[in-house]
């Protein structure tokens, strides 16, 4: 059955599932960490950041988009660790700006959320470099913008955007001169 809209309860569950997924992939993400410093802590920092937000999100008994927005934004900012955590918190901040005044989200809304997330994160980084988490987020936002009018099922939309993010991730080493 196609899901054409998601409400705050559904988004809360999706966010918590995503947080748990990042936590379960922490070591894999640590291995991806090669720039700016190959210190192997990107997964750890992203996990600490998102789990801080997840704690606040999980505490919401009757979530609305506004309360989710606040919990995700403030929780991720308070829990942000390292460059990757700060960037992740800014991606969430931009995304949450778009959802705060909504009742439900469609693929059109999600595409706008991804665009705002990327714009906010790029502005937060003094010298953004391609071949990083920013590149992956930007690619995902571009794919969302490309397909949102054709793909209305949120699950299919999410799969396509995530699959494209993985393609961009695989290509990122080609974009960093220090890795060539």
Region locations from a protein language model:
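N-terminal loops that bind phosphate or other acidic moieties
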Residues: 1-180
């Amino acid at each position: 059955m196609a899901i054409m809209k998601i409400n705050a309860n559904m988004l809360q569950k999706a966010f918590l599932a995503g947080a748990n997924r990042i936590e379960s992939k922490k070591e894999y993400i640590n291995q991806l960490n090669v720039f700016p410093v190959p210190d192997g802590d990107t997964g750890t920092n992203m996990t600490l950041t998102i789990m801080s937000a997840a704690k606040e999100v999980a505490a919401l008994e009757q979530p609305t988009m506004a309360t989710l927005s606040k919990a995700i934004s403030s929780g991720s900012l308070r829990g942000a660790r390292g460059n990757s955590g700060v960037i992740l918190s800014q991606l969430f901040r931009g995304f949450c700006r778009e959802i705060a005044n909504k009742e439900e989200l469609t693929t059109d809304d999600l595409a706008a959320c991804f665009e705002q997330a990327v714009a906010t994160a790029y502005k937060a980084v003094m010298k953004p470099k391609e071949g990083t988490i920013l590149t992956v987020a930007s690619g995902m936002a571009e794919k969302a913008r490309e397909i949102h009018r054709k793909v209305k099922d949120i699950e299919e939309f999410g799969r396509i955007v995530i699959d494209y993010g993985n393609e961009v991730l695989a290509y990122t080493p080609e974009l960093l001169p220090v890795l060539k």
